[in-house]
Amino acid sequence: MNCLLELAIARQLLDSRDFFFLQIGAFDGETRDPLYQAVRKYGLSGVLVEPQQPAFKRLRENYKDQPQLQFVNAAISDRNEERIMYTRRDGNCTAASFDKQHLLKHSIPEEDIIAQPTPCLTFQELLKRSGREHVDLLQIDAEGADFAILKMVDFEHFRPSIVRYEQLHMSRSERDEVARRLVQNGYQLHADRMDVTAIQRAA
């Protein structure tokens, strides 16, 4: 687990006994997952979102002993609708995307790629279904869709204590736009090549 993220979670737990997270792009909950250890160590409550059926089944199985978790089998988009998502034929794909080119860039042979009809929810609909007005941690790893999802979030009114997202597939202008919005809304950013962890500054 990312050391900075774990420290941020542990610190937030001191202030919030009702810690709650949203994880968009949870995959199977275990493979290179930044929250798996913390969920088990602290018994964190939250909603885990994963659009791929095979991965979603493994996700629920891997967390079957964690009754405080909710699971949503959907992708996050700008409308509540069904869209085509591209994934591997064998169902084991950490690079699933609405953009077929994203998989090809990951050296997945075209003959191994299938188009899968996928239910989609807006970010606001996801929040509504979670039943929460405040979220302590927003974790996003959406294989190139992180920027589009972050654009849906109104950080002036929805302010998680911690925001973590993947910046690897963003353009320079997209990285700068997200960083600017977060800084303007009181976050301190800690970035590496792949990810950004944004922590709300103390009032």
Regions found by a protein language model. Name each.
Residues 1-203:
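Phosphate/nucleotide-binding beta-alpha loop and adjacent structural elements of enzyme active sites
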